């Protein structure tokens, strides 16, 4: 594969290399270790270089889509703003919101002499910037995460097209134009709850975050550096044994990387020999990995 990071770095461009975060740095910063594939590193650098193209990330829930933005911001030393999408979210919310209720309340205070008319007339006081609005106004390049865009109304992605493409917008209430001082690095995640419009997809870069089967032991080790290789290997093997059974059984929800990490966090609390013995015959603490009763019946051996 062409090494885009190396090529861009040689030209003095900003690049993401996917450097591992040490356990010590993780504890200090609160940033979880993240081990990206080389393909994902390339996709991130495309988004950084092309500037006006957000990177759309798809993949199984729990595969690390959301954590990527955090890891990129940490490595590059850039601020991160996050916009968690809900079914009620509107595209304008990511730019700004206008607090009409507060202004009405303040107008009532003017009548009784507890607020000045000048303050109420200053509409800027009632404007709150959203994630994109904040990123546009930041004095340095900013990483923006738009999380789970597929939760919103079908028109939501298209309503963002102009602002993402032109890197500017106008506050309707004041007529004030806002233009990006530095183009943000935008990551958008989707769990495929609904299809996204073609017009929106054409303006995005796309990467599917694959389940990191070959990296699982390294991922666990990065999070639990004090644990032994023996325990990590045994836990990962048991986890993959379960996951392959779920794939064969066509389970709608397969155990994910994030659940593996939760599971291992519990396993390591016990004496190693005790857990190793348990792992030989069964799945300890299945509640962490199996989220439906049918899965418990299908993948666990219950005694009569």
Could you tell me what each predicted segment is?
Residues 1-304:
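C-terminal regulatory/interaction module of P-loop NTP-utilizing enzymes
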């Amino acid at each position: 594969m062409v090494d885009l990071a190396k090529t861009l770095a040689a030209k003095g461009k900003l690049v993401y290399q996917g450097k591992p975060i040490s356990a010590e740095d993780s504890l200090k910063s609160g940033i979880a270790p993240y081990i990206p594939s080389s393909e994902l590193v390339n996709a991130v650098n495309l988004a950084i270089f092309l500037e006006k193209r957000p990177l759309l990330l798809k993949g199984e829930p729990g595969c690390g889509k959301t954590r990527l933005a955090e890891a990129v911001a940490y490595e590059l030393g850039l601020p991160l703003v996050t916009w968690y999408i809900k079914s009620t979210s509107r595209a304008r919310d990511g730019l700004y919101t206008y607090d009409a209720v507060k202004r009405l309340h303040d107008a009532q205070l003017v009548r009784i002499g507890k607020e000045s008319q000048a303050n109420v007339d200053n509409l800027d006081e009632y404007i709150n910037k959203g994630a994109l609005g904040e990123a546009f106004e930041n004095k340095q390049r900013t990483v923006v995460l738009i999380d789970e865009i597929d939760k919103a109304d079908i028109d939501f992605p298209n309503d963002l097209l102009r602002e993402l493409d032109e890197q500017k917008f106008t506050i309707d209430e004041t007529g004030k134009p806002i233009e990006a001082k530095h183009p943000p690095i935008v990551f958008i995640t989707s769990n495929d709850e609904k299809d996204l419009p073609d017009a929106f997809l054409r303006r995005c870069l796309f990467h599917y975050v694959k389940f990191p089967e070959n990296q699982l032991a390294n991922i666990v080790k990065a999070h639990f550096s004090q644990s032994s290789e023996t325990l990590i290997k045994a836990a990962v093997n048991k986890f993959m044994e379960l996951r392959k059974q779920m794939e064969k059984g066509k389970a709608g929800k397969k155990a994910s990387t994030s659940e593996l990490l939760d599971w291992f966090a519990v396993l390591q609390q016990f004496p190693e020999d005790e857990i190793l013995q348990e792992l030989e015959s069964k799945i300890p603490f299945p509640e962490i990995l199996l989220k439906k009763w049918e899965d418990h019946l299908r993948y666990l051996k219950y005694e009569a």
